[in-house]
From Swiss-Prot:
It is found in: Periplasm. This is Penicillin-insensitive murein endopeptidase. It comes from Shigella dysenteriae serotype 1 (strain Sd197). NCBIfam families: PRK09429.1. Residues 227-274 are annotated as: Disordered. Zn(2+) 2 binds at residues 147, 150. Disulfide bonds join 44-265, 187-235, 216-223.
Length: 274
């Protein structure tokens, strides 16, 4: 798929995410065994876990938004990754949006994050823990140059490379989305150990955070996984295509009506939203 087509799909997804959503009315996880249902951009979750807000290894940002819910696998991944980072003396992991208590569509900001298997993680690792005020109104660190062609050398740190690599090497991770310039820098820094780069995918924005996505849990029978990323490290022509100018005639698509929910998600809404 060429970059222009991908751009159109991203714009369509964004317009869907801005539609009104009833999912915010569900304020607590739906009881039951953990089940991720549907796809990452059209789904929900039963039996979500709450990420503990207090941890010595990570801090949760924007807790007032209450987007710190996810499948138990996601909670365990965050705890596992942040513990590794802490043990290596790299700093504190900053956790952004996961999902809402029952997953589902946001009213803006995300087209995915619907099945409890996605998390945004800042690409900075402070040595000093942030204050409550900093966590509520976090200042993102833009690692990408103004022209989007490369990372800012004074901001790019070996610890950030290691953070992304550790996440990509996790057994449950299927994709990590970062800005193309960040992917390019990872390709330059990786050396001969490159298998993990396959999971790191270039995507629009993502200049200050990585978006980590887990594979569908084996016992979530209604969860829809994406196809695996293409073979190889993704550092060749596909990556370079992201730096080409947009083709003439590219226009913004009309807003798209959200697709029907999976039946189990619709039934969940019908039961829990008045």
């Amino acid at each position: 798929m060429n970059k222009t087509a991908i751009a159109l799909l991203a714009l369509l997804a964004s317009s869907v995410s801005l539609a009104a959503t009833p999912w915010q009315k569900i304020t607590q996880p739906v009881p039951g065994s953990a089940q991720s249902i549907g796809s990452f951009s059209n789904g929900c979750i039963v039996g979500a876990d709450t990420l503990p807000i207090q941890s010595e290894h990570y801090q949760v940002m924007r807790t007032d938004q209450r987007r710190y819910f996810g499948h138990p696998d996601l909670v365990m991944f965050i705890q596992r990754l942040s513990s590794q980072v802490s043990n290596l003396g790299m700093g504190t992991v900053l956790i952004g949006d996961m999902g809402m208590p029952a997953g589902g569509r946001f009213n803006g900001g995300h087209a995915s994050h619907q099945t409890g298997l996605d998390v945004d993680i800042f690409l900075q690792l402070p040595k000093t823990r942030w204050t409550s005020a900093q966590l509520l109104r976090p200042q993102a660190l833009d690692l990408v140059s103004r022209d989007g062609k490369h990372v800012v050398s004074t901001l790019w740190k070996p610890e950030i490379f290691s953070l992304i690599k550790l996440a990509a090497q996790d057994k449950d991770v299927t994709r990590i989305f970062v800005n193309p310039a960040i992917k390019q820098q990872l390709c330059l820094d990786a050396g001969t150990d490159r298998d993990w780069l396959r999971k790191v995918r270039p995507w629009f924005q993502h200049r200050a955070h990585m978006h980590v996505r887990l594979r569908c849990p084996a016992d979530s029978l209604e969860c829809e996984d994406q196809p695996l990323p293409p073979p190889g490290d993704g550092c060749g022509a596909e990556l370079q295509s992201w730096f080409e100018p947009p083709k003439p005639g590219t226009t913004k698509p009309e807003k798209k009506t959200p697709p029907p929910l999976p039946p189990s998600c619709q039934a969940l809404l019908d039961e829990h939203v008045i």
